[in-house]
Amino acid sequence: MSFKVNWKSLETDSLTSWTKDLLTSALNSGKSPNILASSISIKDLNFGKIAPNFEILEIGELGRDRFRGIFKINYEGDFHLTLHTNVQANPLNIYYSNSMEKEIDSQFVTPNFLLSNEQFALPLDLKLSDIKISGIGIIVFSKSKGLTLVFRNDPLDSIKVSSTFDTVQVLANFLQKQIETQIRDLFRETLPTLIHQFSLKYLSLDNNSDDLHAHFASSSRTHSSALDPDNEFNNFTYSSKNLQKNLQLFNTRETLDLHIPKFKGIIQRSHLEKFTQNYPSLLNSLYLNLHEIDMKSYNTYNNNTGSNGIPIDLLINDKNFNRTNRVLKEISDIQSNSFYKQSNNNKDTTVKPKRRRIKYSTRKKAASPTSTLINDDFHMASLHSSVASSMPMSMSSSLSDSEERPQLLAQPRPMRISPDFYQAFLKSTPEQCWYQCKRVGLGTNYFNFATSQPISTSPIKKDPARDFIKEKKSINYIDINKVNNKLKELSMDRSGKRKQRNYGSATYESENPIVAPPPPYSH
């Protein structure tokens, strides 16, 4: 199936202006490169007189609100388009702009070089003509999803690019390659995206109009049903008690009575200024001390921020340095007054608040006589308890009966144990039954392989250990006594040396005959 396109119908001013606006917005969308000194404008647009050949190869789906088909398009006409812009001819400015974007932040302070920052723009007219297109595409249309256009191949065969820089062959070749690459990207990505967005735009208008008509119709029906006295749903929507309470609360605010009923836990907006006026804060102190802060900025900052912090906005927005300096000085005075205390006699003199200090002194105070008496009594009592524990029960009971110890309210001290306390305890305690009783099982003494004898330990020295000071000796020191003792031992070994024993035979020469070792150990 093929179609004949009436190409002359496109030669209208309305379509030409609409196409120019569409192309201008599409070319200037996004961030422009630094090499361009101005925006791109459409200088000339002409559709030509030769129409393209459009042929439908296949229709996959056809319906009232959807369509899917494959088509073929061929064009070799006289369409031409002229673009106008200004190009940056200063390479230092281009390099500076690129480095600011990629490497350096815009807030970074850089030297202002006149040569690198000066713009040198050159006008550029770019003409596109002799376009040859041959491609196969797929069209999918849906009323809900819009129109989608996709090309199976690269539709651009050739294009002629002419500009004001054609005399420079290097620039002409560069522009030719760049324009061809951009047009191929246009057919592959940009054109399908634009067609899809515009189709959604027009389809959404139709859908919105239908939705508005349906909404108005439903609202008119609900309004008429709400006015119907026979509708039982209205009885459950609003309660008469709630309406009476709301009406009573509304009427209380429309009276001139001084005794207005209050709500619990609520601050009314009419009384909010009185509540925040006496609230201690840094901003209130600044407003009272400095009359330079206007009421408008005070109310704006006080309503926006409820914190008790430093009003940074008042300092940043103010361009007067002297005024900002006075505000900062007043803030420091307020903070210092809150830290230091004023003396009662003179208000100008301030007193630094006392801080809690802990002293770690090395000197020990002399103990009072009462404390020494208490400690001595407690020491005697501890000795008495240790003696009583080591003595028999009868003697301890007699001593306790004869002497009555008074109650001492003093810090307890650890009891000193005699050196032989552990040995005496082991001797006094009888052996347990399981050491002597025999039971059936592995071994004896009911699996208790430990001996019943007490553990022998070295006696604890009664006298404190004395520190013997050893004299330091040099590395070359020779102990004569050790040398003499070693020589005596060697002489005794030589004199008492016996004949060499023969372990291979049964008998060997020795004063004390020894039996030869068994055969495996014979030499």
From Swiss-Prot:
<protein>
    <recommendedName>
        <fullName>Mitochondrial distribution and morphology protein 34</fullName>
    </recommendedName>
</protein>
<comment type="function">
    <text>Component of the ERMES/MDM complex, which serves as a molecular tether to connect the endoplasmic reticulum (ER) and mitochondria. Components of this complex are involved in the control of mitochondrial shape and protein biogenesis, and function in nonvesicular lipid trafficking between the ER and mitochondria. MDM34 is required for the interaction of the ER-resident membrane protein MMM1 and the outer mitochondrial membrane-resident beta-barrel protein MDM10.</text>
</comment>
<keyword id="KW-0445">Lipid transport</keyword>
<feature type="region of interest" description="Disordered">
    <location>
        <begin position="489"/>
        <end position="523"/>
    </location>
</feature>
<dbReference type="GO" id="GO:0015914">
    <property type="term" value="P:phospholipid transport"/>
</dbReference>
<dbReference type="GO" id="GO:1990456">
    <property type="term" value="P:mitochondrion-endoplasmic reticulum membrane tethering"/>
</dbReference>
<keyword id="KW-1134">Transmembrane beta strand</keyword>
<keyword id="KW-1000">Mitochondrion outer membrane</keyword>
<comment type="subunit">
    <text>Component of the ER-mitochondria encounter structure (ERMES) or MDM complex, composed of MMM1, MDM10, MDM12 and MDM34.</text>
</comment>
<keyword id="KW-0812">Transmembrane</keyword>
<keyword id="KW-0446">Lipid-binding</keyword>
<dbReference type="GO" id="GO:0008289">
    <property type="term" value="F:lipid binding"/>
</dbReference>
<keyword id="KW-0472">Membrane</keyword>
<keyword id="KW-0496">Mitochondrion</keyword>
<feature type="domain" description="SMP-LTD">
    <location>
        <begin position="1"/>
        <end position="200"/>
    </location>
</feature>
<dbReference type="InterPro" id="IPR027536">
    <property type="entry name" value="Mdm34"/>
</dbReference>
<dbReference type="InterPro" id="IPR031468">
    <property type="entry name" value="SMP_LBD"/>
</dbReference>
<dbReference type="GO" id="GO:0000002">
    <property type="term" value="P:mitochondrial genome maintenance"/>
</dbReference>
<comment type="similarity">
    <text>Belongs to the MDM34 family.</text>
</comment>
<keyword id="KW-0813">Transport</keyword>
<dbReference type="GO" id="GO:0032865">
    <property type="term" value="C:ERMES complex"/>
</dbReference>
